[in-house]
């Protein structure tokens, strides 16, 4: 189930861990960010700052709400973790183009509720290994 992540050291050794998602995946991203932070990991949820998100959406377009934040905040010592049921959201795909290591936690079926539950389970399993 955790083939999405090689080992917990990838997260522990990152300067910052950026996390993002849309809709239900945004809630999972925020929850996972809290779990990482409580373990002493420098974690930032990219979908938590609505002022920055709406400024980027207004000035550049919603496809760039995550990638523009990463262009300003991130460097190659950081890690991006994305949650997406479809794996097709343009703003997620743009974020993955930013030149930092990343982990994609995407859905495997069209059952959104079941996939969102699976993503939260993965997040909890990762957190328990830190």
Map each language-model feature to its residues.
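Alpha-helical scaffold segments in soluble metabolic enzymes
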Residues: 31, 35, 69, 94, ...
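Short beta-strand segments
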Residues: 20, 46-47, 82-85, 97, ...
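A short, basic/flexible loop-to-alpha-helix module at the beginning of a structural domain
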Residues: 2-10
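Internal catalytic-core helix/loop-beta-alpha segment
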Residues: 61-94
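Short alpha-helices
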Residues: 97-130
């Amino acid at each position: 189930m955790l083939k999405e992540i090689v080992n917990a050291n990838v997260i522990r050794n990152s300067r910052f861990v950026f996390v993002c998602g849309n809709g239900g995946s945004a809630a999972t991203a925020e929850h996972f960010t809290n779990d990482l932070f409580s373990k002493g990991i420098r974690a930032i949820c990219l979908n938590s700052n609505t002022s920055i998100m709406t400024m980027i959406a207004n000035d550049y377009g919603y496809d760039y709400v995550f990638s523009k934040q990463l262009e300003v905040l991130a460097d190659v010592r950081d890690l991006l973790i994305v949650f997406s049921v479809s794996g097709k959201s343009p703003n997620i795909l743009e974020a993955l183009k930013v030149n930092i290591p990343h982990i994609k936690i995407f859905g495997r079926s069209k059952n959104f509720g079941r996939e969102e539950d699976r993503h939260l389970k993965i997040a909890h399993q990762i957190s328990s290994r830190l």
